[in-house]
């Protein structure tokens, strides 16, 4: 199968981790790594790996539109708001790994292929990718009236982009809890833990439900965990769900694959693994459409 060309904008922690994941993709060929700091570790690693590198940001795509059909934006919410319009005009499929929420939210464990007609999709946040599937699973069987999540990540795994987007993180994750998770009302909190040695990503999900059914909720949570594990193997329950009246509390832990950052950075891993899965679905569709076009021409 001919691979679909892609580029990454943003050579920070998330962009660099994604670079290593794309290396093993069977349907996507990473063509370029784009940043704004020629001395960044991400651009240096990309150059060493043999990828074309640019340090002039979005201008690289403007000057070389044939670089990629799919663009992964791993910059910041503010930067993506500027990039989105340019990439839309250039006809690029955009997978946004910032909390900009310019396009519709996508969580691969919840939505199947109903995003493939969109040009720009948003991967919510790392905390959202970890917790929203659980909120959704509970809501499917018990009607969640309120959901609150606390995402705790190692301070070392939070780069400048993450730190600059704390407000956007809470707002976008809250929206995702409600719009994708299905909760009537949501709330999100992020904690950067400076502990040494660094802790694994940990997430607490607290839900108030209208229709309590412990057995159905328990089964729904476990099924969803297994679904997420198909693309994030380090995703797991820290302990069994806790029930108290109309309240359910779930404790998660996410261990990263160690592609770029050590395994404690599960927050990077769940974001990039989810983006890779979504990108590969877009790439598969592009290849299928091209094949169909060739067959129609042959007729």
UniProtKB/Swiss-Prot annotation:
Binding site for NAD(+): 11-14, 157-165, 267
Superkingdom classification of source: Bacteria
Keywords carried by this UniProt record: Aromatic hydrocarbons catabolism, NAD, Oxidoreductase
Active site, per annotation: 126 (acyl-thioester intermediate)
Catalytic activity entry: acetaldehyde + NAD(+) + CoA = acetyl-CoA + NADH + H(+)
InterPro entries recorded: Acetaldehyde_dehydrogenase (IPR003361), Acetylaldehyde_DH_C (IPR015426), NAD(P)-bd_dom_sf (IPR036291), Semialdehyde_DH_NAD-bd (IPR000534)
GO molecular function: acetaldehyde dehydrogenase (acetylating) activity; NAD binding
One of the GO biological process terms: catabolic process
The keyword NAD belongs to this UniProt entry's keyword annotation: yes
HAMAP family from the UniProt entry: Ac_ald_DH_ac (MF_01657)
Protein name per its UniProtKB record: Acetaldehyde dehydrogenase
Species of origin: Bacillus cereus (strain ATCC 10987 / NRS 248)
């Amino acid at each position: 199968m001919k691979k679909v060309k892609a580029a990454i904008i943003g050579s920070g922690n998330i962009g660099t981790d994604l670079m290593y994941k794309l290396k093993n993709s069977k349907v996507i060929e990473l063509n370029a790594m784009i940043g704004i700091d020629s001395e960044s570790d991400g651009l240096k690693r990309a150059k060493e790996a043999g990828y074309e590198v640019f340090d002039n940001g979005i201008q690289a795509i403007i000057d070389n539109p044939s670089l990629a059909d799919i663009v992964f934006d791993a910059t910041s919410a503010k930067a993506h708001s500027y990039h989105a319009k340019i990439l839309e005009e250039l006809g690029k499929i955009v997978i946004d790994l910032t909390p900009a929420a310019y396009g519709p939210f996508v969580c691969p464990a919840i939505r199947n292929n109903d995003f493939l007609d969109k040009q720009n999709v948003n991967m919510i946040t790392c905390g959202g990718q970890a917790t929203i599937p659980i909120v959704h699973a509970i809501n499917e069987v018990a009607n969640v009236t309120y959901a609150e999540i606390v995402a705790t990540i190692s301070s070392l795994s939070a780069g400048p982009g993450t730190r600059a987007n704390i407000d956007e993180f809470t707002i976008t994750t809250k929206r995702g809890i409600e719009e994708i998770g299905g909760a009537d009302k949501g709330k999100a909190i992020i904690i950067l833990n400076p502990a040494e040695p660094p802790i694994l990503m940990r997430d607490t999900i607290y839900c108030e439900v209208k229709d309590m059914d412990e057995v159905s909720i328990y089964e729904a949570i476990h099924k969803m965990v297994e679904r997420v594990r198909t693309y994030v193997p380090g995703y797991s329950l820290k302990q069994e769900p806790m029930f108290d009246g109309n309240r359910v509390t779930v404790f998660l832990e996410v261990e990263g694959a160690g592609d770029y950052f050590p395994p404690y950075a599960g927050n990077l891993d769940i974001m990039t693994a989810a983006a890779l899965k979504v990108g590969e679905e877009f790439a598969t569709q592009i290849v299928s459409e091209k094949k169909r076009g060739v067959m129609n021409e042959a007729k």
